[in-house]
Design a protein with these regions (language model features):
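Alpha-helical transmembrane segments in inner-membrane proteins
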Residues: 1-261
């Protein structure tokens, strides 16, 4: 219920305040509300609210999966460097593409956003593939966690080097993307994003039984017939893909606002 309340507040509040009744009429197609208000709701605030809702669901599931694997309430996709991988992918496109840099990509509009999204997905999945490979070679979760943190630092170091050789305009474009925002997702992008997440989120529910067994500890889970390495591979892959898609569309955002208070 609180999510719905916050969602409607997002539709009502802003630089232009729109009465709640008018927002309801616009969504339901009732009444004759000003065209300006209709454009604000349909083209800006509603896509932003739906994107935040779906992205939050995806990152919450991803965070839960990582917390279960490492049995640590502070674990998350960013710990394994997956978010840093997405940032690195975008950095290669924006900072090293010369005439196709951040300024030119912004002028391409939708196609520019698609290019950034693809770069973020490739970067995230590249780091995730490395993590998956390492997960098959190491036994302890703590070792894998440390390696993931190291990969994240390496990715950030690469980004720093790319910034050093880039022009001011491209660096500014990259920094804006790196702030993370739901507002830059257009209506068409939002529909594609929601469609992809509508497939990925139900698929992640198939791992509920596996996650419950992993909560018992590796010893108990193994005695109950669970293949620990295979389960860890599936969970990390699921968390990585969810994070990659969200980061591609929304930028590097944190999955849990209350994490700093734990």
């Amino acid at each position: 219920a609180s999510i719905l309340v916050l969602m409607f507040l997002n539709l009502v509040l802003g630089s232009v305040s729109i009465p709640l009744k008018s927002v309801w009429n616009i969504i339901c197609g009732l009444g004759d509300e000003p065209v300006t208000w209709q454009n604000i709701v349909w083209k800006s605030r509603l896509p932003q609210a739906l994107t935040a809702l779906v992205a939050g669901a995806g990152l919450a599931i991803s965070g839960l999966q990582m917390q279960t694997v490492f049995r640590n309430p502070l674990a998350g996709p960013s710990v394994l460097g997956i978010s840093s991988g997405a940032s690195m992918g975008v950095a290669f496109v924006v900072l090293l593409s010369g005439s196709l840099g951040g300024v030119a990509l912004s002028k391409l509009g939708f196609m520019g956003e698609i290019a950034l999204s693809i770069a973020a997905v490739i970067g995230s999945l590249s780091v995730m593939a490395l993590i998956v490979y390492v997960s098959q070679k190491v036994k302890g979760n703590v070792t894998l966690l440390i390696i993931g943190v190291m990969i994240g630092y390496v990715a950030n170091a690469v980004i720093g080097v790319l910034k050093f050789f880039s022009v001011e305009e491209d660096i500014r474009a990259y920094v804006i993307w790196g702030l993370g925002s739901f507002s830059r997702v257009s209506g068409n992008q939002m529909m594609l994003f929601v469609a992809i997440m509508a497939i990925l989120i139900p698929l992640s529910f198939l791992l509920i039984k596996t996650l419950n067994l992993m909560l018992l500890g590796d010893g108990y889970a193994r005695n109950l017939g669970l293949n620990i390495k295979r389960a860890r591979l599936l969970v990390i892959t699921s968390a990585g893909v969810l994070t990659a898609i969200v980061t591609a569309y929304c930028g590097p955002v944190i999955f849990q606002i209350g994490r700093a208070h734990v």
